[in-house]
Amino acid sequence: MKLAVFISGGGTTLHNLIQHRDDGHLDVDFKLVISSNPNAEGLKYAEQAKIAHQSVCRKDFSHAEAYRDAMFEPCRTAGIDYVLMGGFLQHVLIPEDFTHRVINIHPALIPSFCGKGYYGRRVHEAVLAYGATVSGCTVHFVDDQYDHGPILLQRVVPVEKNDTPEELAHRVFVAECEAYPEAVRLLETGRVRVDGRQVSW
């Protein structure tokens, strides 16, 4: 299965996925990494793993459709089966031929604490401020709205008394490091089906 990874920052999700592949837990071929930020630290992981990589900046395009094409045409050329978003913060439209072929991981239990502006520390601050007793992560298919597509899988973690955003973020990230590879393994089976908002395998 040929994969592309979209990133914007430090690349911790990309690094985790590469490690799972190298450890034999994922039978995938990372063909391409595309960053929305030419200075993203995560590009070093692509370089170290000898994965083709490039940056495509939204500000270089006058409209959303042109940016969409610039992001996905390299994926078509590389024969990509699925695109994985890992800390990708730039909104991008999903072309019709990539419907249900792009997945993202969000550090909360969608449909709570998600949507535009909910990323990184902000998510965990919101969870704590609301008084939620659980949080977690969600792997979902991506559509044209933020954090909106059908849910592939979720993992739950407790919110502990007197948690800080950093402590909760760490607990959620540990769950993410297992959930995303698990989601990729589900896609590897070829059995995943999407019917409206319902996902089965």
Name the predicted role of every residue range.
Residues 1-201:
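One-carbon transfer enzymes
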